[in-house]
Regions:
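Periplasmic OmpA-like peptidoglycan-binding domain that tethers envelope proteins to the cell wall
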Residues: 37-116
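Envelope-exposed proteins and targeting segments
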Residues: 1, 6, 28-30, 71, ...
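Short, solvent-exposed beta-strand/turn patches at coil↔beta or beta↔helix junctions
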Residues: 1-23, 39-45
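Structured segments of extracytoplasmic/periplasmic soluble domains
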Residues: 21-31, 58-65
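Generic alpha-helical secondary structure signal
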Residues: 7, 18-19, 28, 50, ...
Length: 116
């Protein structure tokens, strides 16, 4: 899920992807942490804030689509610290302006068995 330069709004082209993620999380008993990232343009401090706004924007959209709030266990802001592509090119920077999801399966509590 990628973002335009200096933006945190989600493009409508990603709505179906977010709905699919919501369904996957619910059907497979996962909870998630949403992790925001930026390219390297701008100050480190500004980019941490922008990456947080991106993650919060995704959280809000998932909740709007009906995901239970307790499925989202964290928001992380990485700023420009974890690029997946070079920041030396326009294309690379576009790839770095993203949000990722860390999924963890919830533990299921076994039902007690009554002895008769």
């Amino acid at each position: 899920l990628n973002f335009d330069f200096d933006k945190s709004n989600i493009k409508p082209q990603y709505y179906d992807l977010l709905k699919n993620i919501k369904e996957f999380v619910e059907q497979n008993n996962y909870e998630m942490t949403i992790v925001g990232h930026t390219d390297s343009i701008g100050s480190n401090q500004y980019n941490f804030g922008l990456s947080r706004r991106r993650a919060e924007s995704v959280k809000a959209k998932l909740l709007e689509f009906g995901l239970a709030e307790d499925r989202i266990v964290g928001i992380e802001a990485m700023g420009e610290e974890q690029p997946i592509a070079t920041n030396a090119t326009k294309e690379g920077r576009a790839q770095n302006r993203r949000v990722e999801f860390k999924l963890v399966q919830r533990e299921t509590v076994p039902m007690p068995v009554e002895n008769k």
